[in-house]
Regions:
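Boundary-proximal intrinsically disordered activation/regulatory segments immediately upstream
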Residues: 1-73, 162-164
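Short glycine-rich anion-binding loops that position phosphate/pyrophosphate groups of nucleotides
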Residues: 46, 67-68, 92, 112, ...
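Short, aromatic/basic amphipathic alpha-helical patches
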Residues: 70-82, 169-170, 243-244
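A glycine-rich helix N-cap at a beta->alpha junction
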Residues: 78-98, 184-187
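Structured adenosyl-cofactor binding patch, chiefly the S-adenosyl-L-methionine
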Residues: 105-107, 145-149, 165-167, 172-177, ...
């Protein structure tokens, strides 16, 4: 693997690392193939960078502090020779925003093309479907939960307005699992949900409404085919839209007993709710 020394953050070869604004990275084309514009994303920290290297996403480059070359040597030796590894003195790396997070290990990955929905729905499942979630912490936590609870089976599908799993914060909170858990956007929303039924997948909409059933009760009746289930979760504030609810086969909730004072929480954080429901279904 070619080690490329750099001595300044102004070096044009490391332009990807100068601005870590996610929207700018999303619009950035490959200088070697501008026509194939898909944008890039940033991986921060050793754990996330290692997961990127083992994921289906292509690595464009790495940037390491000089002190991190030896600890990363095993990974560097496995990289294709076309992936440059830029190495900079500590004072240069310190100028990159978020040093306390990346600790001198960064990488740029290339976004893939759109996934085929039919191929994804043919996967084993279960499926987690997110409508308009905008909090990157929650997105990252949901991907981490899916990796922990669903193993290799879970697929995540996103409405067009759901936050980007490859944004730096989402990716960081997911511990890099957003690179490993299969996911795609459903551009025709919510009409795409009708394709679940055609694929034999039962859609369960999570909502605390009176017409919903405890997810554990519903899960008990699905023991023969737990993988052919899609768990539909809505935005942090308003929950699922009326249109999304109308496509569901059933509405489910997480029953919460009263606390010591007799008060009952009206809802759970969406990432926590996803984890509890997935655990019940699996």
């Amino acid at each position: 693997v070619p080690i490329v020394p750099v001595t300044s953050l102004d070096d044009p070869r490391i332009a990807d690392y100068r601005s870590l604004r996610d929207q700018e990275l999303l619009q950035r084309a490959d200088p070697l193939n501008p026509a194939a514009h898909r944008g890039v994303f940033m991986a921060e920290g050793e754990l996330v960078v290692r997961r990127l290297a083992g994921s289906p996403f292509a690595l464009r480059s790495l940037l390491l502090a000089e002190s991190r070359v030896e600890p990363m040597r095993d990974l560097l030796e496995r990289l294709p020779p076309v992936v440059p590894v830029f190495v900079a003195p500590q004072n240069v790396v310190n100028e990159i925003i978020g040093f306390n997070i990346h600790r001198g290990v960064l990488a740029v990955g290339e976004r893939g093309g759109p996934a085929d929905l039919g191929a994804l729905l043919a996967r084993r499942g279960p499926f987690v479907v997110l409508e308009d979630l905008c909090n990157h912490d929650n997105i990252g936590a949901i991907f981490r939960n899916c990796a922990a609870l669903g193993g290799a089976g879970v697929t995540v599908l996103l409405s067009p307005r759901t936050a980007d799993p490859l944004y730096r914060k989402s990716l960081r909170v997911s511990m890099g699992h957003a690179l490993l858990v299969p996911w795609a956007r459903l551009e025709k929303w919510p009409d795409a949900l009708h394709e679940f039924r055609a694929a034999g997948i039962r859609v369960l909409a999570m909502t605390p409404g009176a017409a919903s059933r405890d997810v554990r009760e519903v899960a008990a009746g699905l023991r023969d085919r737990p993988s052919r289930v899609a768990l539909l979760l809505g935005t942090e504030g308003e929950g699922l839209s009326a249109q999304a609810l109308a496509t569901a086969d059933e509405r489910v909730r997480i029953d919460m007993p009263p606390g010591p004072t007799g008060a009952v929480a009206d809802s759970l954080n969406v990432a926590v709710a996803a984890a509890i429901a997935l655990h019940a279904l699996l």
